[in-house]
Regions:
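Conserved SAM/SAH cofactor-binding pocket of Class I
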Residues: 1-84, 94
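Residue-level signal for inorganic ion chemistry
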Residues: 30, 111, 148
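Conserved hydrophobic residues forming the short capping helix/wall of the S-adenosyl-L-methionine
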Residues: 56, 101, 123
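Short, conserved active-site loop motifs that form the nucleotide-linked donor/cofactor pocket
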Residues: 64, 105, 129
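A short glycine-rich, Lys/Arg-flanked "PGG" loop and its adjoining helix->strand segment in the class I
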Residues: 94-106
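Conserved beta-strand signature within the Rossmann-like core of class I S-adenosyl-L-methionine
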Residues: 104-115
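Active-site capping/gating segments
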Residues: 114-154
Length: 154
């Protein structure tokens, strides 16, 4: 359910990269509810990406790509959004994926509790757009969405 709570933050017909996709959350969920999105699921584990490829066949999600590689070695660029759920600390997330985001793009990081310390450690070339508390039906736990972009000076 928490993956669905970020749908309204994503504009139509955009390119999304889900880093550390694991079982396809949130990327595959976004692709199911928003067929207008071009989604790339990225994970270093060949076991996980094999599962994702099979799931995509079963779900008939044709606009979704799966890549088996480490994010540092991934060379595709120009993503409008880079999303993660439990991938890493914010600083590492934006630093490792900086080369993949387009100039007007956004990072969307799904977090549990409010990430005070992580926000303080973000690089100077980033700017926090918003931190939204996510309301997730049937879940009595803290969830937050951190939205970050490249700073205007960059």
């Amino acid at each position: 359910f928490d993956s669905l709570s970020i749908v309204r933050e994503i504009a139509y017909e955009r390119c999304i990269l889900d880093v550390g996709s694991g079982g396809g959350v949130p990327g595959m969920i976004l692709a199911m509810v928003r067929p207008d999105l071009k989604v790339t699921l990225l994970d270093a584990s060949s076991k996980k990406t094999a599962f994702l490829r099979q799931a995509l066949i079963e779900l008939n999600l044709n606009l979704v790509q799966v890549e088996t590689t480490r994010v540092e070695q991934f060379s595709s660029t120009g993503f409008d959004y880079i999303v993660s759920r439990a991938f890493s600390q914010l600083n590492d997330f934006v630093s490792l994926t900086r080369h993949l985001l387009n100039k007007e793009g956004r990072w969307l990081a799904m977090k549990g509790g409010y990430p005070y310390e992580e926000l303080q450690k973000l690089p100077s070339w980033t700017e926090v757009v918003d931190v939204k508390k996510l309301e997730v039906p049937q879940l009595n736990a803290a969830r937050h969405l951190v939205i970050v972009r490249l700073s205007e000076e960059y």
